[in-house]
C-alpha cells in the first residue's frame, strides 16, 4: 500500500491531484502544509507526497518552493495539471447577502478576490490553511462563506451558491 501525504483536510484540490496519479492502493494522509508533506516523506511516514507547485493566477506556490528547499533528497517523480474551479458555499439556508466573512487559502484568494469583492462586498477575508479547511470553517460557524472545491461542500454539508 502506498501512503501519500497531501494538503488536507479531505476535499482539497491537492487530494484531487492524488487521484490523477491513479494510485489504486493509496492510503491518504492529510497534513497541514507542503512542508509537513515533504517531511513525512523524509521520515518514512509516507512513500509519496503530492504538493502544489504553481497556479495560473499567482505563479509559484512559495510555501511548496520553500518546503522543497528544506527537504534535501526529496525528488519530484511526476506532475499533473488540474482544472481549478471554485465553488462559493455557505451553511444550508444562509445567503451570500448576509455574509460578513469568507475564507479560502491565500493562493485561492488571488483567484476569487475580484468576484468576492463585487458579489459579496461586505465579506472580509480570512486565510485558511487550505481551501477545504475554509469549508470546515464555514461548517463550524467560524466564517460565513468559503471558496473551495465542490467536493468540500459535499463533505461538510454546505450549500453551493456559485
Identify the function of each model-found stretch.
Residues 1-162:
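Domain-level signature for soluble enzymes in the chorismate/prephenate branch of the shikimate pathway
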Amino acid at each position: 500500500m502506498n501512503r501519500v501525504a497531501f494538503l488536507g483536510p479531505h476535499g482539497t484540490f491537492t487530494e484531487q491531484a492524488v487521484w490523477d496519479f491513479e494510485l489504486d492502493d493509496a492510503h491518504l494522509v492529510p497534513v497541514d502544509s507542503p512542508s509537513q508533506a515533504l517531511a513525512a516523506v523524509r521520515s518514512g511516514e509516507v512513500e509519496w507526497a503530492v504538493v502544489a507547485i504553481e497556479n495560473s493566477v499567482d505563479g509559484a506556490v512559495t510555501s511548496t518552493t520553500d518546503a522543497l528547499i528544506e527537504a534535501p533528497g526529496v525528488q519530484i517523480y511526476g506532475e499533473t495539471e488540474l482544472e481549478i474551479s471554485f465553488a462559493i458555499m455557505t451553511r444550508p439556508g444562509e445567503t451570500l447577502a448576509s455574509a460578513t466573512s469568507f475564507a479560502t487559502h491565500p493562493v485561492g484568494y488571488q483567484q476569487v478576490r475580484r468576484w468576492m469583492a463585487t458579489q459579496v462586498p461586505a465579506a472580509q477575508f480570512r486565510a485558511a490553511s487550505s481551501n477545504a479547511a475554509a469549508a470546515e470553517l464555514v461548517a463550524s460557524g467560524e466564517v460565513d462563506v468559503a471558496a473551495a472545491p465542490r467536493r468540500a461542500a459535499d463533505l461538510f454539508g454546505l450549500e453551493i451558491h456559485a
